């Protein structure tokens, strides 16, 4: 299975919706797309909606961590939302939730960042 990437900007937030599998075959594509948006637009925060992401491996975790570091350097925050149980377990085991906030929905994540829907 491949990775579907839907990226849109809402005020100063880069909203990323992923579907399918984020693994070593697809991680570089996501990295390039997100980094390109961060370079070209006035983005302060990232919301990553993982509701339809069925699989993630360590390469996917690396991409998430790398984008977290990028947005932190810009003074922003990353929020992961609507995460599936399997992917949530991977985040839990990796310790990423110690630095990246988890919200139940994209709507709630945007509200947390002060962006109206």
Swiss-Prot record:
It comes from the Bacteria. Phosphorylated by SpoIIAB on a serine residue. In the phosphorylated form it could act as an anti-anti-sigma factor that counteracts SpoIIAB and thus releases sigma f from inhibition. It comes from Bacillus licheniformis. Keywords: Phosphoprotein, Sporulation. GO terms for biological process: sporulation resulting in formation of a cellular spore. The modification Phosphoserine is found at residue 58. InterPro entries: Anti-sigma_ant, Anti-sigma_F_ant, STAS_dom, STAS_dom_sf. This is Anti-sigma F factor antagonist. Residues 3-113 form the STAS domain. NCBIfam families: ant_ant_sig (TIGR00377), spore_II_AA (TIGR02886). GO terms for molecular function: anti-sigma factor antagonist activity; antisigma factor binding. PANTHER family: ANTI-SIGMA FACTOR ANTAGONIST TM_1081-RELATED, ANTI-SIGMA FACTOR ANTAGONIST TM_1081-RELATED-RELATED. Belongs to the anti-sigma-factor antagonist family. It holds the Pfam family STAS.
């Amino acid at each position: 299975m491949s990775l579907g990437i839907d990226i849109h900007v809402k005020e100063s937030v880069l909203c990323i919706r992923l579907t399918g599998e984020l693994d070593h075959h697809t991680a570089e594509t996501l990295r390039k797309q997100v980094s390109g948006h961060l370079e070209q637009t006035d983005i302060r925060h990232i919301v990553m909606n993982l509701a339809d992401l069925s699989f993630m491996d360590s390469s996917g975790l690396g991409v998430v961590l790398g984008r977290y570091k990028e947005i932190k350097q810009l003074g922003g925050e990353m929020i992961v939302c609507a995460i599936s149980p399997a992917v949530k377990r991977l985040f839990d085991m990796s310790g990423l939730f110690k630095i990246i906030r988890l919200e139940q929905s994209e709507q709630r994540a945007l509200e947390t960042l002060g962006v109206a829907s």
